[in-house]
Amino acid sequence: GLLGSSSGATAVSVFLLYYFSAPMGWLLFGGVAGALGAFLLVWLISFRHGTTMMILSGVAVNVLLGAAVTLLLSNAESPWALAELYRWLQGSLVWATAEAVCWAFPLILLGIVCLYRERRYLDLLTFGEETAATMGINLQRSFFTVSIGVALLVGATIPQTGTIGFIGLIAPHLARIWLKKPPSQLYLTSALIGALLLLIADLAVQYVPFFARIYIGTLTAILGAPFLIWILFTQQRRLAQ
């Protein structure tokens, strides 16, 4: 999210959905193109200027793309199309069909390969960038590969589900707290925990009366943000001890 991938995928998907009523295949490739394009823009702006500049560039690109989505929605002539786009933006599994999953599978597989290739980089990064560099890791190349992998995964997912936040942040933290293993050994566990959290959220908005009028993305944000803050504070206290 900080590097603009999710915003890029969202903006391109909204454009294709409203103006072209694009089928799922085109939406998936458009989402990936938007995610990759947004990340590459952030990377080109900041790759010589350090992490802080990259985060600030990502925030700026996110704001710009968010404004683009708002502009597209404000120009929507059909109230039905606007309502459907709003529902999609808030997060829903209505469009996550078997056909969509089949279209997305090659892109998701390529993203997984990128992450798996850089598993050693992710393990060493837990000790800091300096330690990773002294162990022979090419930091810029590894970071670029990981970011491309994430962009592929995000771009192939958002056209099917809309923007559903915090699950991708919470699941790895829970996996690491429970298993206490390095990141490279938590890929599958994190994915399963994330899938379970998404399933619980989907069932809650469908069958729990209190959540009946909100969408999945809204529910995950309401519950996920405080929970993530609690996890971060808990980990900080453990490190302080």
Model-derived regions: residue spans:
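Alpha-helical transmembrane segments in inner-membrane proteins
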Residues: G1-Q241
